[in-house]
A protein has these predicted regions:
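A short His-aromatic
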Residues: 95-99
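Hydrophobic beta-strand segment of the Class I
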Residues: 91-92
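Short alpha-helical segments and helix-capping/turn motifs at coil-helix boundaries
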Residues: 6-11, 24-28, 105-107
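S-adenosyl-L-methionine-dependent methyltransferase catalytic module, highlighting the catalytic core
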Residues: 61-82, 105, 109-111, 115, ...
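Class I SAM-dependent methyltransferase SAM/SAH-binding core
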Residues: 16-82
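Short conserved AdoMet
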Residues: 17, 101, 115
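Class I SAM-dependent methyltransferase Rossmann-like catalytic core
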Residues: 1-18
Length: 271
């Protein structure tokens, strides 16, 4: 890893009880928690064969070591059932939550596996400095609605929103300068392609990996403060952190601290 990558990992871990056991979700080729130093379980929603296949096709993974995961968190299956119900003390998810179709339900399952006082470290892309620039931030109503609907795959609406409103960020965009109108932006997909993919995922029950939710530091705090105040999520928010050592301009970090021992999903963490 580069010095910046090491600094980034050290900052995220500095707020976590890494002397105890934890979990990192979807580390891919950029794990935050070094399992040669810490007692951490690596988990992904796909198995090791699929992870290695994806890495082989990803130019960004060239020359990178892709660690094996210890367990598969199968979509629609509670996390505790996938890893065993051994209590954990922290969880890390870097650039993962935005891909999850039911973010509140997903976070509840993670909290169910943590001891009271346990921490979840979440690194997210900032809409204001990413391919999601032209999209609307995810709302409180959407987060709660998805937790009621419980989609196990990105929905046609989520697919449609991502494909039809994101743009191709090739790393040269100056987000500090005035941005062009969306109609002038370079896109990965046309509106017609977005419609076709949305119809396809419904017709074929296909899992298409997209950014299901869109966040800024302020919007995340606003939405999850309301979720917590509404009694839907027993946690305390710590952060957000931007511009921390080794971070990129297009990301931010927030921690959620579990404040209750009650099960959130109906699956007791100790059973």
């Amino acid at each position: 890893m580069t010095e910046a990558e090491v600094a980034r990992c050290e900052f995220v871990c500095s707020h976590l009880p890494t002397e105890q056991r934890g979990i990192e979700i979807a580390p891919y080729f950029h794990p935050i928690v070094d399992r040669s130093r810490f007692d951490v379980i690596y988990v992904d929603c796909i198995d090791n064969d699929e992870i290695q296949r994806k890495a082989a096709e990803n130019p960004g993974a060239a020359g990178k070591t892709v660690p094996l995961v210890d367990a598969v968190w199968t979509p629609g299956v509670p996390l505790g059932d996938c890893i065993g119900h051994e209590p954990l003390h922290y969880a890390v998810a870097s650039h993962v939550l935005e891909h999850v179709p039911n973010p509140l339900g997903w976070l509840k399952e993670i909290l169910d596996c943590l001891e009271p006082g346990g921490l979840v470290a979440i690194v997210l892309p900032n809409r204001e400095r990413s391919m999601d620039y032209y999209r609307q931030p995810t709302s409180f109503a959407q987060v709660v609605g998805w937790s009621i609907e419980k989609p196990a795959r990105p929905t046609p609406t989520q697919v449609m929103d991502f494909l039809s409103q994101s743009f191709e960020d090739d790393g040269t965009v100056d987000f500090d300068a005035p941005m062009a109108a969306f109609a002038e932006a370079k896109r990965h997909y046309t509106d017609l392609q977005a419609i076709e993919f949305a119809e396809f995922v419904l017709r074929e029950s296909h899992y298409l990996d997209v950014h299901c939710s869109v966040w800024t530091p302020d919007s995340f705090i606003d939405v999850f403060s309301r979720v917590i105040t509404g009694g839907l999520f027993p946690a305390k928010i710590i952060g957000p952190f931007t511009g921390f050592p080794g971070s990129t301009p297009g990301e931010f970090l927030v921690y959620l601290e579990k404040t209750s021992s009650a099960s959130l999903t109906g699956s007791p963490a100790g059973s």
